[in-house]
A protein has these predicted regions:
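Small/polar loops that bind or transfer phosphate-bearing groups
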Residues: 11-12, 40, 181
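Short glycine-/polar-rich loops that comprise or flank the Walker A/P-loop
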Residues: 6-8, 33-36
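Amphipathic alpha-helical "lid/sensor" segments that cap RecA-like P-loop NTPase cores
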Residues: 49, 53-115, 173-175
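Conserved nucleotide-binding/hydrolysis micro-motifs of P-loop NTPases
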Residues: 15-19, 43-45, 185
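Sensor-1/coupling segment of RecA-like P-loop NTPase cores
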Residues: 1-28
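C-terminal leucine-rich, beta-strand-based interaction scaffolds used for sensing/assembly
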Residues: 3, 114-117, 122-190
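Conserved AAA+ ATPase "SRH/arginine-finger" region at the nucleotide-binding site
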Residues: 36-47
Length: 190
C-alpha cells in the first residue's frame, strides 16, 4: 500500500531504536531496505549555546560559555537534558557559572530518585553489576580480563546481562562501546 502512494514521504521515529532498526534491516520484515536511515545527532555545541544564551539574556540573566561547555560535555549534548538543566539553572540563578552545573545535575537526578530506585530494584544482581560496569568503564572494554576480574563476574554472565539490558533498551551499543540510554539514569548510577 505504501509503495503505491505518490507525493507522500513517511517518517518512522520513536524511542525503540532497535525495533526501528529491525524494521528496515531485517530481511524477513516487510520494510526491509525500503528506507534511508537518518540518525539525529546532538545539536552542535556552539549553535546550542547561542540559543540558550539568547534565552537567558531575554530575561536579563547570563550563562557563561565555560559553564555551558561543561554542561554540554557532562550530558554528551543530549538535547532534552541540556534544556532541562538550563531551565533549572535559569530558575535558580541570575548568572550561571561553571560551579553551578554539577550540583544542579545532581539535584535533577535526585528528583527522579524514587523512579530510578524502583527501576534499579527490578534488575537482577548481574544486570545491576553490568550497569555499574558500564558506568565505571565508560562502556568500553567491558569484556576484558581486567574488568571481569575487578568486578568478579564471568564473561558469560556479563554478556547475558548486557543482552537482556539491550533487549529491554536500557542500554545500547555503538562503536564497540555500551552506553545507558537515559543519561540522567547513568548519572544517578554514579
Amino acid at each position: 500500500y505504501i509503495q503505491n502512494i505518490d507525493n507522500i514521504g513517511f517518517v518512522f521515529s520513536g524511542s525503540k531504536k532497535h525495533l526501528l532498526t529491525q524494521m528496515f534491516t531485517n530481511y524477513v520484515k516487510p520494510f526491509y531496505a525500503q528506507a534511508t536511515p537518518l540518525e539525529l545527532l546532538p545539536i552542535p555545541k556552539e549553535r546550542f549555546y547561542a540559543f540558550v544564551k539568547e534565552k537567558f539574556e531575554i530575561s536579563g540573566k547570563t550563562i557563561t560559555k565555560e559553564s555551558f561547555d561543561a554542561l554540554y560535555e557532562l550530558v554528551d549534548g543530549e538535547s532534552w537534558l541540556v534544556q532541562n538543566v538550563c531551565y533549572h539553572l535559569w530558575q535558580n540563578f541570575e548568572n550561571v557559572e561553571k560551579e553551578h552545573i554539577e550540583p544542579m545535575i545532581k539535584e535533577i537526578a535526585a528528583m527522579s530518585d524514587a523512579i530510578y530506585k524502583m527501576m534499579f530494584d527490578n534488575f537482577s544482581n548481574t544486570q545491576k553489576s553490568a550497569l555499574k560496569i558500564i558506568v565505571n568503564n565508560k562502556g568500553a572494554n567491558l569484556l576484558s580480563k581486567d574488568v571481569l576480574n575487578l568486578n568478579d563476574i564471568s564473561k558469560s554472565s556479563l554478556v547475558s546481562a548486557l543482552n537482556v539490558l539491550l533487549d529491554k533498551e536500557v542500554i545500547d551499543k555503538s562503536d564497540n562501546a555500551y552506553y545507558i540510554n537515559d543519561k540522567l539514569f547513568e548519572m544517578w548510577l554514579k
